[in-house]
Amino acid sequence: MSQTAPSDTEYNQRLERWSERLKSQTISHLPTDYSRPVPSRLVEAVFERTLPEDAKTALIKVYVAAQAKGILVTPFNILLTIFIILVSRMTGDEDISIGTSSENAIPFVLRTFIQPSDSFLDLLAKVCDLEKEGSSDAVDFSDLINFLNAKLSKKDDPRKTLVHLRFYNAPDAPSENFLSTTGLDVDLTVLVSVKKPSDQLTSLRSQFTFPDLQLKLIYNQLLFSESRVNIVADQLLKLVVSASKDVTGPIGALDLMTPTQMNVLPDPTVDLDWSGYRGAIQDIFASNAAKFPDRECIVVTPSVTIDAPVTSYTYRQIDESSNILAHHLVKNGIERGDVVMVYAYRGVDLVVAVMGVLKAGATFSVIDPAYPPARQIIYLSVAKPRALVVLEDAGVLSPTVVEYVEKSLELKTYVPALKLAKDGSLTGGSVSKGADDILQHVLHLKSEQTGVVVGPDSTPTLSFTSGSEGIPKGVKGRHFSLAYYFDWMAQEFNLSESDRFTMLSGIAHDPIQRDIFTPLFLGASLIVPTAEDIGTPGQLAQWANKYKVTVTHLTPAMGQLLAAQADEPIPSLHHAFFVGDILTKRDCLRLQVLANNVNVVNMYGTTETQRSVSYFVVPARSQDQTFLESQKDVIPAGRGMKNVQLLVINRFDTNKICGIGEVGEIYLRAGGLAEGYLGNDELTSKKFLKSWFADPSKFVDRTPENAPWKPYWFGIRDRMYRSGDLGRYLPTGNVECSGRADDQIKIRGFRIELGEINTHLSRHPNVRENITLVRRDKDEEPTLVAYIVPQGLNKDDFDSATESEDIVVNGLKKYRKLIHDIREYLKTKLPSYAIPSVIVPLHKMPLNPNGKIDKPALPFPDTSQLAAASRSHSKHGVDETLTATERDIRDIWLRIIPHATDVNKKASFFDIGGHSILATRLIFELRKKFAVNVPLGLVFSEPTIEGLAKEIERMKSGEMISVMDIGKEETREPEIEYGKDALDLVDLIPKEFPTSKDLGIDEPKTVFLTGANGYLGVFILRDLMTRSSNLKVIALVRASSEEHGLKRLKDSCTAYGVWDESWAQKISVVNGDLALENWGIEERKWNKLTEVVDYVIHNGALVHWVYPYSKLRGPNVMGTITALKLCSLGKGKSLSFVSSTSTVDTEYYVNLSNEITSKGGNGIPESDPLQGSSKDLHTGYGQSKWVSEYLVRQAGLRGLRGVVVRPGYILGDSKSGAINTDDFLVRMVKGCIELGLYPNINNTVNMVPADHVARVVTASAFHPEQGVIVAHVTSHPRLRFNQFLGTLSTFGFNTKLSEYVNWRIALERFVINESHDSALYPLLHFVLDNLPANTKAPELDDTNTREILKRDASWTNVDVSNGAAILEHEMGLYLSYLVAIGFLPKPTLEGKKLPEVKINEATLEKLASAGGRGGAPTH
């Protein structure tokens, strides 16, 4: 149905309506298998599925139900609605935008808001209405994007797309050109159609009786695996069936689980060995000590910067000293389950204290002296300990803490200064002056265990996590978990008594328990570093290597510190277990580059799950260098360890496990969960849940009746911990985390509850409203940003500042005093890591249509805004108080700390957003600036500008001065800007050209040919020789003599089977070199050439895909200038110049091609002046051809007649099959046969037979226009890359289609890991870099070429103006030729028979030494 075009006024009104419809639009992305490439790249693939009978029946049932409710629907409406539901389930978004089109194939955006509680019929009705509304208000897609971009502020990035997901009725879909033009930023396009037996597409908008319904999913292989797309199709069909069963039920509860998914996902009903208690960790340790008392247990190391011996403690010494403390606790009334608080430091005494508390049957908890006293008091108030153990080396308690302990706690005992001496003797300190050591009375019991029995449900640990009301939560651990998983881990990760573990975790964080208990369980060693070795970047790696550590537990932040500025490898390290925060691919790579043998194990869990965690292994680079290439930037959480399940549960209907890709909440189901929260039964009941999936009566309790610990076993409890994390299942069954269901987050390993920060902020008297978010800065680092609306301020509270147009900068300036005050206030309430790095004052909070704070609309200050605010601060009085050194240091801080706004000389580097990683960068910036060897640990001891400046001044003037040797810069050949060089070279081309004559077909002609003995040159020569008896060819050949030159030419022709002895009479040779002046031809011969030559075919060039422009400039550019010079002298001559489509190898021309073809054009016009590639060409060869073309076209303006011939890939002869084995595509063919795989790349390939290209070149020489024109040589039709390589299996070669990412990884393994001499090795950089993008070519208009070939048909009696192509027949011919010459093996599988080719012995003999010009890998 045609529609009348709207008036300009109506059209603008439509654009305004669309602008309103798409306001604050959420553009959803589907979950991917691979990281999104930046910038966007596309490797298209297609997956097709025919609807099964149950899905077709379900469509009819929905249709009938909708009709009964008066909803006029079509099958397409139903499927579109199903797709919207699936997208919402995959993304968690409630604002869904899908690209679709009207019945007139006009694309538009269908945007709908969706709630899980919506009924299917209600949503279906809404979608139908929105589809009608969008169809009737159609506008051009590009016009809409331009209209929306025109409304953006200068700070906003322009929109490139309006949707990432598209769903079309195939007959109504926009043109294929539109789909490809707009496809770069699209995740998935679904085309739905009905196929009749006639194979004609039938619309889904009108009928329900159909034989076959087809889904065609077009997806980006750089984002999705085929298995993922297969599952998406399954889920789409499953949702159709589910909806048909309950059209009025909530869409959030629709089942999308399929048998395929169930095979890889955990079964939430299985027995997880609930009664499999392994024993208490302290008893296992005591048993180990009895078995091997003299084995090394704890090794305390000195700093690597000093030469001192280690202090080593045996299992007996740790066992005996912990017995002493345990007996002291028991004799002072400590009972099973009492909390003993340990004021600790990282060292052997902590191990003694922990094991002593456990042996007493008590619960240990740790306070870190680094916490502010107020925070320590909070921990004490929550724990209510009955004993306090202070480690002597941890320092003394703060007076305020001591006062709290004395007034508020009822301690049974207090150990003031626990210390294990180097000889193994233990002291506890004296509680009063002159009194005996507090442990004196139990020293005689050191060899005796306490005998206190604990069971799986006894409480060994009390660990703290962030709380929502400003009060930390105390998590009560259980003994079950502490030892249960170690046997499995030892087997799975090859851990043993020979290992040397590290003690690197934060002492008050529960990961420290892994550090201690793992080696003690295994009978291994625990190596303890100094604080200096941990805190000084680069030093920790030295320490790890020096002491040959083999296993470590790290947070990602600690891993970054280990790898930062490290240059000493750690070959001994074989496993690194990461916990506590998201682990990135970059984190893994940094560590694995340092430790080539380390397997990185990402472990997902929480304090509440104790040792019950998931795991995902990144194998060592010594085993698999390519593994990380297929991983996304964030490493998955993986799957549960032995008898641990990660259940991703539907948030709307918790009775359902989520399908693969569906976002849900992560629950951990295991027997090793913690007991709950101390003193908070209500929260415990919300987070530790009895499983509703299984019948507990079917589980068997295998606890022995006589087990002494049975009284401390609560029986089988099938429990799950509700993590609050959002996640998804991957197609493998692994889980990836995708955010938080609440506001709890982790930054640098610390778990932070945003609610806690918001609570404290809201209590500040000058804060009316506030919200805290996590944003990613320009380096993708998570950053805490607090937004506040100030209140109750006086004029004196405002900082004077010059007004700026930027409201963010104004706020940061105006409220600087308030920001500083809030920061100081939060320091008294929160640990430093929980204080927002950026505080942004606002006049009011932006609200969304639902009346909630519009989080996406909150401004995130960028670097320039923060710098502007800081500059303003500097201008208003700060500079006057800073020395020159201090000013320089401040400037460095502002440059490297992304969000520093309140920088003064006394501010701590770490308080304003610095951390250990940035500290490393700071030190090197200081070294570079001041040319002194600033110690790497200086910022930790002097974290202020003032302190750093004093130390640097001292170094500059004193003994420590050490000018840095920054080395000499490598001498480089200066780069030449090819576009500018072309302009400069115009002066070298002749000022004018004599007019060439149009000779008749029978008139004598002399052709000068360069590159005659190259691959294409051979076929150009053959084409010339078969044209006329009155034609002579003078060939330029690089040789020692004319005789030698003729032999070389003859050998090349013979090698490709084209030589005819009769040619010798019509061919003469001149010796020369393209790079030399006049090609090195002696003057007499040069002068003769100017008088006898009628046509110049300049085909010669140095083809190399790595050489820079500067190396190719001589033969390719200066050689072309020589050709122009020859044309300008003597008689008039026309020029046929062989260029390459590598001159249009830029994104500009790909986009221009898409734009032209989307409007019905044929592609890049031959008249285009190529300014779109005057920069951004990436190969020196393409650049040299661009400059040469430019000069030839300039010569055309000065009278030259000629044609620039622009071919793409030049493949074999369509008659004989002879082909250049050094061609890129031929190497691809051989490489894929070697690998047994070929990549699924959907790009079209512009490849043409060599004989057709030769015909275009010669025809262009004989039929030039006035001036210089371009003749594109393009394939008609073009095969796609996967079709081209797919012919291998057609003809019986053992190759299989592979997803591109998998093919790329397999190739890299094949070439690098297995050291195979692949045919692709010389081009590996090109293939592995980005083959799909490198092979993506613009479409080309070839009008000029067609006209030239039509004119030439009267000379040759053969009309080839319709072009040529390489299809299955030609590929068979080429493959047969390559087999015949021994380049390829014979096919081994059944397939089409290769056509017969005839190759004589002379050809085989000469082939080995033939010169060749390969087809361009850049077209």
From Swiss-Prot:
Catalytic activity as recorded in UniProt: (S)-2-amino-6-oxohexanoate + NADP(+) + H2O = L-2-aminoadipate + NADPH + 2 H(+); (S)-2-amino-6-oxohexanoate + NAD(+) + H2O = L-2-aminoadipate + NADH + 2 H(+); (S)-2-amino-6-oxohexanoate + AMP + diphosphate + NADP(+) = L-2-aminoadipate + ATP + NADPH + H(+)
Names of the cofactor(s): pantetheine 4'-phosphate
Biological processes per GO annotation: lysine biosynthetic process; lysine biosynthetic process via aminoadipic acid
Record carries keyword Oxidoreductase: yes
Domain (Carrier) ranges: 880-956
Gene Ontology terms for molecular function: L-aminoadipate-semialdehyde dehydrogenase activity; phosphopantetheine binding
Pfam families: AMP-binding, Condensation, NAD_binding_4, PP-binding
Coiled-coil regions, chain positions: none
Classification via InterPro entries: AA_adenyl_dom, ACP-like_sf, AMP-bd_C_sf, AMP-binding_CS, AMP-dep_synth/lig_dom, ANL_N_sf, Condensatn, Far_NAD-bd
Gene3D superfamilies: 3.30.300.30, ACP-like (1.10.1200.10), N-terminal domain of ligase-like (3.40.50.12780), NAD(P)-binding Rossmann-like Domain (3.40.50.720), Nonribosomal peptide synthetase, condensation domain (3.30.559.30)
NCBIfam families for the chain: AA-adenyl-dom (TIGR01733), alpha_am_amid (TIGR03443), Thioester-redct (TIGR01746)
Identification of the protein by name: L-2-aminoadipate reductase
Species, as recorded: Schizosaccharomyces pombe (strain 972 / ATCC 24843) (Fission yeast)
Primary gene name: lys1
